[in-house]
Design a protein with these regions (language model features):
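Conserved SAM-binding strand-loop segment of SAM-dependent methyltransferases
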Residues: 1-8
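A mobile, often basic/glycine-rich helix-loop segment
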Residues: 31-49
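C-terminal catalytic and target-recognition region of SAM-dependent MTase-like enzymes
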Residues: 9-10, 14-21, 25-27, 48, ...
Length: 135
């Protein structure tokens, strides 16, 4: 097991990877109740840039995953463009990707992934989508 921090838009693994946990950069809207300063630091125009950055990271990391490997996509956001819509676009572009449903009694199942809302009494707003590379 090797844990590292690097620029995920350009980083290249020396060998194909078994698993990638992508805690993607996001608006952090899901942690707003604990970090109210986010209201002052974010603008609505930031979302499109963040979504584009997420796409760039996914585009760089996906080819580095082994066939049969798993990518876990995570954000601390509750916004659909950063979460479910991001995954819809990803699956539309990658026929070699298959969602591995997260069977859990927490959160709300989405068309792709699982959304945890801050109002559910289980902490902050987070989104999770588990993806298997099938070819």
């Amino acid at each position: 097991l090797e844990i590292l921090a690097a620029d995920a838009t350009t980083w290249q693994a020396p060998d194909a990877l078994d698993c990638i946990v992508l805690d993607a950069p996001c608006s952090a809207i899901g942690v707003l109740r604990r970090h109210p300063d986010i209201r002052l630091l974010r603008q609505s125009t930031d979302i499109a840039q963040t979504v584009a950055l997420q796409q760039q990271i996914l585009k760089n990391l996906w080819p580095q995953l082994k066939v049969g490997g798993t990518l876990l996509y995570i954000t601390c956001s509750i916004l659909k463009p950063e979460n479910e819509q991001q995954m819809q676009a990803f699956f539309a572009e990658h026929a070699n990707a298959s969602e591995l449903k997260i069977e859990a009694d927490w959160g709300i199942e989405q068309a792709y992934g699982r959304q945890l809302l801050p109002t559910s009494g289980q902490g902050d707003g987070f989104y999770y989508c588990r993806i298997k590379k099938i070819a």
